[in-house]
């Protein structure tokens, strides 16, 4: 596997059990927190005269200009996945309704339009886990608790390595239980339990490696919060941190599993193959930072490239334009890396082509999901309006922030 040294091995592996992630605590934080299920109130800003109109770059250019395909198992898998996660975390009716609208299964469906129902369900459940897990570090109780963050990651790593106790559906640690079921499933074939060939040890090592990159990014993010350095970093330092904490690396490898892609070591270890993963992670996070800009302002989220560039003296429109340039540069970096890749041979190249398709679908699915589900807008209709007009309306009193 491609590896990098974060310089924080001791921090990532040690720590006493500082936090009990109980169902009651999860439910309480979902009701009061600022995560993906929290819907900011837009209704008080209906007058266009009170808005600053920001023009977005064309986010559907280059690799994103292709039509998306939806997995045929989407409808049936969505119903089961939504019901299951709500049951596991003992969610109330309001949260369950919001979760249906967030629609993690749609996201998984665009990521892997040809995978089995079992693989699609696993991908949808991974999305549910990732957002619940991430919210703890992003705006939740671990966002400024470095020791607590390191400890929670250590407990989750034990699950991945098979050294943790078995959790149950009625466990006091529902997020850990969900992750344990995912580890169980990913060790199997994407066709289902005891169906087809189980995942190789080589693939599972890659799956663990991708999650380690994610967790190292989360620790770096929390450390930045604790040190109060959100707006003192340069764009490159921000990208280096966010491309890990975004969670795109494990999501991408999870989609490799959904398609039965097991990259040979000579492919997986090639620097340009990893560079393509980095590039697409950058594209996803930069697009996300534009579309989430208003929501991040409302919720006080500092981890946003537009906000970072504004802190450096740019106007909001100038900052958005600059992020648009960065996104287009991602495509140039992608094609440059692609042109320099060697040929590995028929079987390895077939796996590589599958990997490249997964990367493209991941970026496209993330983009479409943000518009379709109204994730960052007051409704799906508002998301459709933003996509059509490329106009993002920000209350003037907020635009000055």
UniProtKB/Swiss-Prot annotation:
It comes from the Eukaryota. The keyword Iron does not apply. Mg(2+) 1 binds at residues 134, 139. Its cofactor is Mg(2+). It catalyses: (2E,6E)-farnesyl diphosphate = (1R,4R,5S)-(-)-guaia-6,10(14)-diene + diphosphate. A motif (DDXXD motif) lies at residues 134-138. Belongs to the terpene synthase family. This is (1R,4R,5S)-(-)-guaia-6,10(14)-diene synthase. It comes from Fusarium proliferatum (strain ET1). The lineage of its organism: Eukaryota, Fungi, Dikarya, Ascomycota, Pezizomycotina.
